[in-house]
Amino acid sequence: MLAVFCFCLCSTAFSQTKEVNIEAGKLSEQITEEEQTTLTSLKITGKINGSDIQLLRKMAGKAYETNVKTNGKLSSLDLSQAQIVKGGNNYYVLKSGTSPKYYQPTEDNVIASYMFTGLTTLTTLKLPTNITKIEKFAFAGCSNLTECTIPESVTTIGDNAFAQCSKLKTIAIPSAVTSLGVAAFKGCEAVTNVTFAQGIQLGKIGKEVFSNNSSLTTITLPQSVTEIGDRAFYENYSLTSITFPSGLTSIGVSAFETCPELTTLPKFPSSLENIEDKAFLNTSVTAFTVSSANDYYTSEDGILYDIDKVSLVLYPAGRVSETLNIPETVSSIAKYAFAYAKNLKSIELPSGLTNINDSAFVFSKLTSVTTLASNLAIAKYAFSNCLNLTTVDFKGAIASIGDYAFQNDRKLSTVKFVGTSIPDFGKYVFTPKAVELKIHVPSGYVDKYKEKIEKKPAVLGSKYQVLGDITDGVLNPSFDGNVFETARYNVDGTKVTTRTKGLNIIKLSDGSVIKTFEK
């Protein structure tokens, strides 16, 4: 009886693994009906075409049609000594509307589109060593695949080729690769190591290539790379370190957005020409530094400016300081420049500032904002979702405030306008809910402000008041004998040394700012 039991075990083991040598289209002749659902390991030598791929998909849990499951259990597939050739039956059909699209190999030595997509039973896969291209969605959704070595002969990896291979642990890009498609490795959550072969001539890390990864901590980009595409490393939750190539010219939109552990960056190289919106949004970077030879950007105290310091481009969200005085040369604050600033509590905006762009301070931890600027234009969502913001003091005339500029600022209770020229308000600039908003305006201008506010409407709901209690540009001024003047500006924001006729903006030694009207 023991002998019979041992024989059964051996038979079962034999039925679960197999090695075959075949001609193209002949795999079905060497795999029995029973083996199609019991084999867990298979090695193929010889040539295979679309007909063979169709059977392999069935053995690995997926039928010819999209998302149709089978009872196949194949987990290990070795094609290292096989060759994929064109021809044979369709191995996959993608049903989209009334026009299904069929796929079969049309070239030799190519992992064609959708060839192994969705094979959730596969854990290891060895590819033919002579493969030259891996096309779109070739392995997408192989959610249990832990090991797949890309052959040295591969030159192109297509869009979403390995997307959602959520258990893949390492990615090694061969030296022959010159193109990585959109989202090629998107959602490979378990990848801890990405390497590029020495001598690789890859010029661009494409859009979303390594996005949505929760395990990768560090990456060194090859020297050949000049562009980092949009969302290339978006939502890399564990990324702490990256090395930029010396010839890098551009960093795309949201390239490193929501990389919360990214605190330090290498110096931006002299070649860098363009950093797009949200490139480092919602990171913890503490300082930006730039090569002194860069012609486009410069930095001061870890803050990134354009080369002339006319535009403030990026404020490091992880910077520890709670206050900031922006240089007088700055006339524009870029989109998302201060977004998610974690520690900044108060800011004084300079007199020469003319533009605060979209979402410039969104989700920052500001509690107060003071601006000395006249004719300032504030774009939509500029200060939205500043959940701790309580006070905004416009000490110069405001030209316009865009839609939802202070949306969802739940604690905002005080806004002061000294300008007698009423701003052009956008829709729902303010959205008071829990706290009543008090809008202070110059004496005698309550009705004019109310008219403009109500016309849009600029305030959502009725939980606000417009109060005409600012006289000569000063709200209830009071002076302490120990406080003295440290600086004075005229109505245009120009620094002056003596009293000038008209509105004077005065900075005091206690840090406060008042306004007086000199006749």
Where do the model's predicted regions map?
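Bacterial Sec-dependent N-terminal signal peptides
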Residues: 1-17
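Boundary/junction segments of secreted and surface-exposed precursor proteins
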Residues: 12-31
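Structural signature of tandem-repeat unit edges
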Residues: 17-22, 40-48, 66-91, 96-110, ...
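Terminal processing/anchoring signals of secreted or surface-associated proteins
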Residues: 42, 304, 449, 473-477, ...
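Consensus positions within tandem repeat domains that build extended binding/scaffold surfaces
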Residues: 113-115, 135-138, 158-161, 181-186, ...
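Extracellular/surface-exposed low-complexity segments
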Residues: 436-472
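Residue-level detector of functionally pivotal "anchor" positions at catalytic/ligand-binding pockets or at interdomain
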Residues: 468-495
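C-terminal tail/sorting-segment detector
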Residues: 503-519
